Amino acid sequence: MRNHQDPIETDAVIVGAGPVGLFQVFELGLLEIKAHVVDSLAYPGGQCIELYPDKPIYDIPAVPVCTGRELTQNLLKQIAPFGATFHYGQEVTVVEKQSDGRFFVETSKGTRFLSKTIFIAAGVGAFQPRTLKVDGLEVFEDSQLFYRVRNPADFADKNLVIVGGGDSALDWALDFVKDGPNKAASVILIHRRDGFKAAPASVAKMRELCDALEMQFIVGQVTGFEAQDSLLTGIKVTGADGVTRVVPLDVLLVFFGLSPKLGPIAEWGLDIERKQLKVDTEKFSTSEPGIFAVGDINIYPGKKKLILSGFHECALAAFGAMPIISPEKKVFLQYTTTSPKLHKVLGVESPVFD
């Protein structure tokens, strides 16, 4: 049932509750701007939680290693003082500029806002994994065919076939081979060629494990499957030699990456290049003043799709929004190490130096 109460009036609506969207809450909070956050998933964390909650992340500054789940939990703890309101399980479907300069925003569940600014932190847009194109195979999805790993324990002691040549395929193959509670009975990696778009160290480790007969790597493409009694029993793999072989399995994991789908964002009248939102690099504004884009959803010369790059973009976007939200206020750069004002906002005591 749609909710047609008066719109929620706010300074900022953030679209996306992944790591970058969460950090946007923090940067706005330091400027005393409260935000409402909308995400299509039922929980925060975005791609980190949906695709690799237990995979290690090594490139967050001052954090040698953390999982996607830990990063999300730490960000939620970091933004807690700012009291953001979250609206999960709904997608922003309508964005309309009003005569007073604000934006009318409505979600798929009928939640409505009047906001001075919008921050799009929607990652690659809707989560649409690239699927394995084999007729009939889709009937096994979520029973024996998976495009993501939510709980590694579900695959312990299974005969796994993993298809893909990127970081996700290699990382999960290595994870399921190593000793531990999630160790698989066997792991076979399949990729269409003997070359990978993955970390060289991971590729080297995979080859080392293959030489030690702890896993297998097959060059070829999945062209069919075998089933018995409604169970997937094997896949047909055609090699470069043209020979098709049957590879037995219990579970098939496919990691072909995500197919970017902007969804309703594509209808908001913003400049788009290669399914991403064009922004300036001064304040990460889109072609519509008052709408900003941060993280993987944006594109600009030199863009790197890294979490730490998204964090940097959040800071400049927050400062860029201040003249729109509070044009009468002068904004001075302050530091969380020394500013009593920021300490008050964060709910911490100011240090006393002798």
Swiss-Prot record:
Task: Give the EC number(s) under which this enzyme is classified.
Answer: 1.18.1.2
The catalysed reaction is: 2 reduced [2Fe-2S]-[ferredoxin] + NADP(+) + H(+) = 2 oxidized [2Fe-2S]-[ferredoxin] + NADPH
What is the enzyme's class at the highest EC level? oxidoreductase
Q: Which UniProt keywords apply?
A: FAD, Flavoprotein, NADP, Oxidoreductase
Database matches in InterPro entries: FAD/NAD-bd_sf, FAD/NAD-binding_dom, Fd--NADP_Rdtase_type_2, Ferredoxin-NADP_redctase_2
Question: For FAD, which residues are the binding ones?
Answer: 39, 47, 52, 92, 127, 296, 337
Q: How is the cofactor bound?
A: Binds 1 FAD per subunit.
**Which cofactors are required for activity?**
FAD
Say yes or no: keyword Transcription present: no
- Domain of life according to the entry: Bacteria
The terms under GO molecular function for this entry are: ferredoxin-NADP+ reductase activity; flavin adenine dinucleotide binding; NADP binding
Q: Where are the transmembrane segments?
A: none
Q: Which SUPFAM superfamilies match?
A: FAD/NAD(P)-binding domain
Describe the subunit structure: Homodimer.
Q: Which family does it belong to?
A: Belongs to the ferredoxin--NADP reductase type 2 family.
> What is the recorded name of this protein?
Ferredoxin--NADP reductase
